[in-house]
Swiss-Prot record:
Coiled coil: none
Protein name: Glycerol-3-phosphate acyltransferase
Pfam families per UniProt: G3P_acyltransf
Catalytic function, reaction form: an acyl phosphate + sn-glycerol 3-phosphate = a 1-acyl-sn-glycero-3-phosphate + phosphate
InterPro entries found in the cross-reference section: G3P_acylTferase_PlsY (IPR003811)
Broadest EC class assigned to this enzyme: transferase
Subunit organization: Probably interacts with PlsX.
Organism: Chlorobaculum parvum (strain DSM 263 / NCIMB 8327)
Amino acid sequence: MLTFLAIITVAYLIGSIPTSIIAGRMLKGIDIREFGSGNAGGTNAFRVLGWKAGLAVTLIDIAKGTIAAVPVVAFFKAHPLGAFPDMNEIALNLIAGMSAVIGHVFTVFAGFKGGKGVSTAAGMLIGIAPISMLMVIGVFILAITLTRYVSVGSILAAIAFPLIIAIRKYLFDLGTGLDYHFFGKWLVHDSLDYHLLIFGGIVAAAIIYTHRANIKRLFSGTENRLTFGRRS
């Protein structure tokens, strides 16, 4: 139990690092939540701080999810604080990753007012199911290219993930996943564990929930399209 609590606590604290708020303070001396969409995420960093800062914020937020889901669990597996949790390891990876997502949305370092969690959730799933996530990223980029609405890309990508896992696992009969090797050595495991379907559905529901205001603006025609380096 102590090891499990340590994993989710460390993962939550990693997710809580308020990347865009730190960037806003460092680059312009502002609280980014008072500008643009008012959100402390990568998309608003693109709008308010410019594309370079927005890209850096997004990549760091992605890394938070990946680190929390995979290296943190691996570290405590090698150095447990007592017994290691007796549960499916992919499920544990997902729980750790979701702890980071919760930390990003409800950051303890910024009054529990963070971002929407899309980049951190993506990072979690990149670490666990990288090939499926490459396909999801393709959906995300295509949706933004066609609509210039990041919210549309985020929602469609979130819905696409469990669908892609289900198609690869059951339609193409790929089992629990594949190991990809480089020069005869293990490189990365691309999981298709059934827990991904469950958590993928949870993540999709959470992303849709955190974008409920965006959905209302989309229907009313007032949603912000993606721009770079402008305050709106």
